[in-house]
Amino acid sequence: AKRMSEVTGEEAKTIHRLLQVDWDEKDNPVFTRNERNPLECDCLVVDELSMVDAYVFESLLRALPFSCRLVLVGDNDQLPSVGAGNVLGDLIASGLFPTVQLKEIFRQSQESLIVMSAHRIVEGKLPDLRRHDSDFFFLPQEDPQKAAQLIVSLCSVRLPRSYGYSSVTDIQVLCPGRKGELGTVELNKHLREAINPPARGKAEAKVNGALFRLGDKVMQIRNDYNLPWAKEDGTAGEGVFNGDMGVITEIDKPGGAIHVRIDDKDVVYDFERASNELEPAYAVTVHKSQGNEFPAVVIPVLDPPRQLCYRNLLYTGVTRAKQLLILVGRRGVIDAMVENNRKTKRYTGLKWFLLNEE
């Protein structure tokens, strides 16, 4: 929603917010916009449809008036929704709806090796890992500890020195998973100590085992529709969303509050809320990055869990990079990810119901 507002200049909302989500006693979503209380719109555009599960999509359809035009936008080669279903893929595969494939690239130039590599990955072909004269690099490394050290060096020293990137706002490490030496948990510890080390006078707070330090890069890990924010121009509102990233600008220990700058908004968390909703974001999972884009992306590809070693995950990570992409690890892992088109094994019934509806 944030990115769409930036690009279009129009208000954009998450589907949950559009449908005015509430929560039942079991913390399940309940949408107050539905067939009895429909939306008031003539045309609705839904972006990133590959991330929308079957339940949310059904709820959206129930809330639309029959006169509304629905335009669906998404990349069927990216990661499927976390929840059940393969909505975008099934709608396309049914052949019942007018479909247009967009081929012109706006994030990079057509000559970009990032673009060429993304196309090859989608086609099940290995990207060119030998070139070192473009925006896509592969740095071979067999040892997880040395790979972690290399990633930390890239993010804290080499890329800022060579390209002028900010270690906090421009460079993003994307990991297949959270666990292991090259998962987000361990890498965040190493990256934080290199990029934002402790110092005399630099405020810190430890809450429920979570460490927060002034200057830390953090990510909102769940939607919070009631969290207030304010801008310098006096504009105020509510709502911070899953995947939003920011930097800690103040830690008020006496007041038990943490201030985070998310884009041009100042968001104040009490300590309890921060420990439940914020995580370090020097490294995040590819899943959490979906829908975002970054000037420079570094991806470890050395020892991901087998269940995360598949094509759509690699493709999604690669396509988050706008200007520079670096893969660190083993060529064999990249081969395995490109060859494994596991997404085809997600079993759903939407296509069948569409084609057999009486």
Predicted regions and their residues:
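Conserved helicase motor core of P-loop NTPases
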Residues: 76-239, 249
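Residue-level recognition of short, solvent-exposed, well-ordered loop/turn junctions
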Residues: 65, 213-214, 241, 289
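Structural motif
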Residues: 43-47, 174, 219, 298-300, ...
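Conserved two-lobed SF2 helicase motor
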Residues: 12-17, 279-282
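Short beta-strands and strand-coil junctions in structured, solvent-facing domains, enriched
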Residues: 52, 79, 226-227, 304-307
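Conserved helicase NTPase catalytic core signature
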Residues: 1-9, 180, 273-275
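C-terminal accessory regions
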Residues: 123, 231-235, 242-358
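Conserved helicase motor core of SF1/SF2 NTP-dependent helicases
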Residues: 2-7, 15-30, 35-142, 216, ...
